[in-house]
């Protein structure tokens, strides 16, 4: 089910034809927003890095209680990029210096941005989960999504209660908007009011 997504991600290479070997390349899903201030923390000697991002579901400030952080946006120097999908699949974690058998992917940039997952109306979430390819992937979803979750009313109630809309054990809590959120959101609270708890 991932073939189409991986192909599309690798098509990013088409836009890199004129990139210089020392240019910084960043790969993100659309809902992963890198913090502009964190980009400055990337240094060329790192080769590769991942941005640790605050993880929110359904609303701009509804944060996952079990998994509040997400390793999202990837960055690397162009000359080290094999493919965009390869970069996306790199597993970043702190490894001891003696693990010479593994690429040392220790470069985790803190306060690296925001992952606004499923920032959609109940109607659009219903459409997504009825059609998303991952729901047929036995490694992502162990079972088919129960039909009891696939209706607008159920989705709306789960969102209001801070529960996962398809019945997984994850829960979400409102976080007060503060300087840890994007400046644009803070300055435009009124505009985004329907997306803020």
Feature map (PLM): residue ranges:
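Conserved catalytic core of nucleotide-sugar-dependent glycosyltransferases
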Residues: 1-5, 32-139
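Active-site-proximal specificity loops/subdomain of glycosyltransferases
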Residues: 1-27, 36, 181, 189
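Acidic-enriched, low-complexity/disordered segments with a strong bias for Aspartate over Glutamate
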Residues: 23, 29-31, 101, 136-137, ...
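C-terminal accessory extensions appended to soluble enzyme cores
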Residues: 108-197
